[in-house]
């Protein structure tokens, strides 16, 4: 499973209190329908962002470029929100990062979801289904809006060397 290549995406959400926005890295993201336009995103069942999506019903998907600047931008998003998820990590990688969008250039969609200024492309989704599958929850979202901002190769697990698998 470690050898399966995936795209790497930043999933944006409004915090439960509605005051702040946050983001997490996801690699289990896929289109599941042309008509209507639906995507699926798999979240760990205890993911902070999943709680935000359940509360507000919307999320954004940001695609990043396969380049050095985007790698640095993405690095904090690979950190967990909770310190309980840092087992086996050392040094800076063992630190929980709460508000990963703080200090990063971004804007909010009409529905309040964050879009990174550095994104190659983005889309905003309304959650339609939550499917419990093993140790993850698959959120099926209807694409409401989105745009390709620029052309470049998208970031993948093959490019970064990062893996998330069991």
Predicted regions and their residues:
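Basic, polyanion-binding surface patches
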Residues: 1-166
């Amino acid at each position: 499973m470690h050898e399966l290549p995936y795209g790497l995406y930043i999933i944006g959400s409004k915090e439960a209190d509605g005051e702040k926005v946050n983001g997490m890295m996801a690699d289990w993201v896929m289109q599941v329908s042309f008509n209507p336009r639906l995507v699926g995103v798999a979240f760990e069942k205890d993911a902070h962002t999943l709680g935000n999506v359940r509360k507000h019903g919307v999320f954004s998907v940001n695609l990043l470029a396969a380049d050095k600047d985007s790698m640095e931008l993405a690095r904090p998003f690979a950190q967990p929100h909770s310190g309980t998820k840092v087992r086996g990590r050392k040094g800076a990688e063992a630190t929980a990062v709460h508000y990963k969008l703080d200090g990063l250039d971004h804007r909010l969609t009409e529905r309040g979801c964050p879009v990174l200024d550095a994104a190659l492309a983005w889309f905003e989704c309304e959650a339609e289904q939550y499917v419990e599958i093993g140790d993850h929850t698959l959120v099926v979202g209807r694409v409401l809006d989105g745009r390709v901002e620029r052309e470049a190769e998208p970031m993948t697990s093959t490019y970064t060397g990062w893996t998330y698998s069991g």
